[in-house]
C-alpha cells in the first residue's frame, strides 16, 4: 500500500531530529525550475498570489532566494520531521523508531507543490508553495499543468517497487488533484472521517486533518499491507462504519465528546 498525504504550511526546523538518516528528493530538477519562476516575484506579488500577510510574503521571498540546489543536513531536514500541521500532529513522526521510518520510507509519500513527491526521509529546504497556487511557468498557467504526469509516474514507480496496487488517499482534494487516477496503476481507497456535531456527523476540517495523520501512523506502526486491515482503525475514539462506506471509500465516525 502507498499512503498519500498533503504537506503542511507550518514548518519546524528547530526541534531535535529523531533520525540522522536522509535521502534526497527525486524531482529536484523540476523544483529548480519552479524556484527560478518564484524568484521573479516581489514580496507584494507573493502576498497577492498566496493570499498571505506582507510579513509572510517577505519570509517566503527570502526562502525562494536562499534555496540552493545542493541539499545537506545543514540547510535542510527530513520532510516528515519538517512539516508541522494538523496531519503531522496526528502522525507524530518524531516518536518513530528506525523501523517505523523504514516502513514509512517505502509506504508513505507527501505530495508537494515545489517538490512534487517527497519520501519521509527526503531532505527539504523550507518553502511555501501550495499546489493550488496559480504560478505561471514554462509548462502552463499553474502547478497542476507544471507537474502534468510527473507525480503520477513517480507514484507508479513506488507502487511497482513494493509490488502492489493499492493507494490510500489521505491527501486533501487540492493535492490529490495533482494525481491522474486513470493513469495510476492502483485501486484508490479514500478514508473519510466524520465527527458528530449537534447530533449530525460531518467532516470538521481540523479533526479530519489530524485523523489523516492518525490513520497514517496506524498503518505504519502496525505494518499494514492490505486495505481491509484499515477497518480496525480506532485511534482517539474513531470507529469504522460499514453501512456508510462504499466501494473505495471507508467511513470512520466519532461521537461528540460530552
UniProtKB/Swiss-Prot annotation:
One Pfam family cited in the UniProt record for this chain: H2O2_YaaD
GO CC annotation, single: cytosol
Top-level division of the source organism's lineage: Bacteria
GO BP field: response to hydroperoxide
Signal peptide: none
Family recorded in the similarity comment: Belongs to the UPF0246 family.
Protein name: UPF0246 protein YaaA
